[in-house]
């Protein structure tokens, strides 16, 4: 069993009076789905009025730790996105929809396009995913949480151009020795300025994970 507050692990198998299986007893995962509030400043203020940038940072740390915990148990989330994680007012997180988790040789058969690692090809259930795939999805999720919903590959241009940039791992933000190609500019939104205020090590880690397309084995396990 996974003994961690970030996962509602089944406590008991339930049967009817004829000893037929009817379900499982699980702890309640309280909170609000991350995608409901975190990507808009107004919604965040409405949901958690006392939260500041400090609380968002703490939330990101808790998300990273929760993914790391599951990886230690050999579990790959697979379909990691803001709709399958519940957030409480104290910043604690609970992963839900665990029926799509990849456990041992049972693949995750679903996925969410925006959080899909660019090296994916074919149907989701045709291959086993790795920690590296989760790390990519987590990096997108952390970036969007810190920038109030701005996609890391969003740029001044069309939606098709953003998708192509994600496929090739081309960011419109500089980090380490990486410089964006000519003409790649972030969209003119408040979130674009967050990048320059992030600690250098965090910028480098996120940038590396999001642009490491050809050599995905070089992505760290988790941040």
Which functions belong to the PLM regions below?
Residues 142-203:
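Conserved C-lobe activation region of Hanks-type protein kinase-like domains
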Residues 67-88:
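Catalytic-loop of the protein kinase fold
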